[in-house]
Amino acid sequence: MEPITVTAEADVFTCNVYLVDGETTTLVDAGAMPGVERVIAEHVDDLDQVVLTHQHGDHVAELESVLSAFDPDLYAYAEHPHRTHSLADGDEIQIGDEACEIVYTPGHADDHVSLIGESALFSGDVVVYNDGAFDDGSFGRTDRPGQSRERLIESLETILQRLPESVTAMYPGHGDPFDAETGGETVRAVIERALERAERREPKYPE
């Protein structure tokens, strides 16, 4: 699996948006970068589906543009006017050429899911990497209304319980993708460090 970060050149605040070509060409989140649909079109002619990790504005602001341009199916945990398929914990969904398990991971958002495949984890905002808070593994913020550090800690533990040892890459909602081959450690180690920091009740952004 080789996702393309189609928001890599964004000059506005947005999540990372990943395009995965293959048997089921998939966009993970839609982001908030105007013109994202044009960047997608530079890489693929058709888009089969959009899968949302959650529905915060930085993940869905440009969803309408993507849906209008490609008319893909829309998968989401929470209700959405354009949702064609609901997601539930334990579901399996094809991302590119790889089957991924849907893992319900609330804490940062009540509707948050992560996607775990054989080789890759799409962690959304539950686990992030090199995002300006900590360079080597951190967690999404939990200080806003409706968010919960306790639930996020449980979600990190759930990911660790269900993460295959074969996963060597992590694609977070913010920061940089992580690859074990170049990162010098495992995806599991990055998540464990994020969990340790969350359990110490460290603030998301240290002073």
What is the meaning of each model-derived region?
Residues T24-T26, Q49, E98, S119-A120, ...:
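Structural motif
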Residues V50-V60, Y104-D111, M170-D176:
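Histidine-centered catalytic micro-motifs
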Residues M1-I40, S114-N130:
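Conserved beta-strand hairpin/beta-sheet module of binuclear metal-dependent hydrolase folds
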Residues M33, D110-A198:
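Metallo-beta-lactamase
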Residues L19-G22, V44-D45, P164:
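Flexible, charged surface loops at secondary-structure boundaries
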Residues N16-Y18, H85, G90-D91, V113:
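Residue-level detector of beta-strand structural context in well-folded domains
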